[in-house]
Every structure is written in C-alpha cells, then in structure tokens.
Amino acid sequence: MAIVSAEKFVQAARENGYAVGGFNTNNLEWTQAILRAAEAKQAPVLIQTSMGAAKYMGGYKVCQSLITNLVESMGITVPVAIHLDHGHYEDALECIEVGYTSIMFDGSHLPVEENLAKTAEVVKIAHAKGVSVEAEVGTIGGEEDGIIGKGELAPIEDAKAMVETGIDFLAAGIGNIHGPYPENWEGLALDHLEKLTAAVPGFPIVLHGGSGIPDDQIKEAIRLGVAKVNVNTESQIAFSNATREFARNYEANEAEYDGKKLFDPRKFLAPGMKAVQGAVEERIDVFGSANKA
C-alpha cells in the first residue's frame, strides 16, 4: 500500500480495540528498521520525525523523500503515514507543504484559547490536502528535543473543545512523560483516561511517552480508548545497548566477519538497527496491531 494519511487506520484501531505505533526515526537506518518491522508484522505504522530529528536529517523535505522512496524501494505493502511529532505552527505548515501525510501541531505551551484557534487553522489547511492532524491538551511531561513539560492531567473541557476543532486524534496528558520513567513514577492516571474517553466517545486518544510504561498499563489504556502509542526512547536504548555490545566485543565480531575490518559503518550500525527492528516488532505485538494492515 502507498503512503497514506493516518486518520483511517488510527480510527480503525480505536473502533477495534488495538493501537497503532508512532515510531520516531533519526536516520536512514532507523527508517529501514521501522519499515522492516511493520512489514514483518503486517502492521500499519506512523514513521515520525521530531523537529530536532528532521533538522539533523537535512530538513522535512529530505525526510519525506527518504521515507517515501524507501517504502517504494523496499516493496512495503502495509499502510505507512509520514508524521510530524510535536511540531510548532510553522513546522506543521511546512510539513503539509512538502508532503507529510500526518502532522501533530503542539500548541500545548500556548494559552488554551490560542492553542484551539491555531489548531483550527492547521486543521483547515491540512484537511484541504488530505493530511491528518493530531493536537495536544495537557502538557506531556519530560523532555524531548528541548520541549520540556512537567506533566499533568488534561482538563476534560479542554479536550472536548480541542476535538471540536476537527482534529483526527488527540494527545492528552494522563500522567505520561517523555524519556525514561523515574522509579517514583506513579503510573498512568487510568481513571482520568476513562473520564476523558467518556467525554469524547469513540475518539482516538494518543499516548505519548510510550517507552517504559508497563505493558499491562498500556493494554488497559488501549482498552479505554488509546489508539496510537508513541515510541522513541525504547528504540534509542535498544540501539545504544546493541552498538555498545558490538564495540565491546570488537575482536570477536571481527573474527565472525572473516577478519574484515569493522570500520565499515554498515557493519558497525547493523546490530543497532537489528535491535531497533526487534524493539518495534515487540511493541507492535503489545499494541495489538500485528496483522491489521
């Protein structure tokens, strides 16, 4: 299947009691790993770029072209959306212009009324081009690419107002954070999520900071209405651990590769990319989106 907008497969997840993964990419190899995992599991997927990752990779146009061409060259058959994660207003508009099929406008740092007004503007522009829109109420805790939030519970009335702007799925604070979870983290506020989904019945909720949340809490959140789960830190840790292990065992690895010098970056990066693919496949299984393409 070609590159698609995300609203239909996210809504299908909401209606059928599973969640799709929004997996952040950082380069060519990560993109390949995510696509291989999605294809192996026959799962719809959003490949996401943060503003920082897109800058690192050469800009939004480069990211869009890279993902689009890899989907074609790798023969990917599952639905793939190209998604902007936590984008400012100008970034959201640029992504719509260069061919992203899904965007998140994050105006959660703005006063509520301004957030709602700007989101409505983004929705109008995006939907005119067939691009799905995610927006946020209630700051997601932690830090990601310089965006820092204390973490809070999204006000129910704000969530209802945000849904009325015409967005396709809603990121809402329910005690979740970006990055590794501290030992004293109290867990997801599932009771608040239940109230939230009751206020916007049938509407897809997005769980940010999906890395490190216990699987039982993720599954319960999905049962209550979460239809998209974002994953980044988990993939980064998997990549880092595998690469460090490879470097520690350099001589043994060199023998395994028939004595070839391992300064070739393709060999050096391979274990980390395999680990990312494995991490993505494992999350797809937990989210229940395998064989839902």
Swiss-Prot record:
Dihydroxyacetone phosphate binds at residues 179, 209-211, 230-233. Zn(2+) 2 binds at residues 106, 136. Catalyzes the aldol condensation of dihydroxyacetone phosphate (DHAP or glycerone-phosphate) with glyceraldehyde 3-phosphate (G3P) to form fructose 1,6-bisphosphate (FBP) in gluconeogenesis and the reverse reaction in glycolysis. This is Fructose-bisphosphate aldolase. Zn(2+) 1 binds at residues 86, 178, 208. NCBIfam families: cbbA, fruc_bis_ald, PRK07315.1. D-glyceraldehyde 3-phosphate binds at residue 50. Binds 2 Zn(2+) ions per subunit. One is catalytic and the other provides a structural contribution. It comes from Streptococcus pyogenes serotype M1. Pathway: Carbohydrate degradation; glycolysis; D-glyceraldehyde 3-phosphate and glycerone phosphate from D-glucose: step 4/4. Its EC number is 4.1.2.13. Its cofactor is Zn(2+).
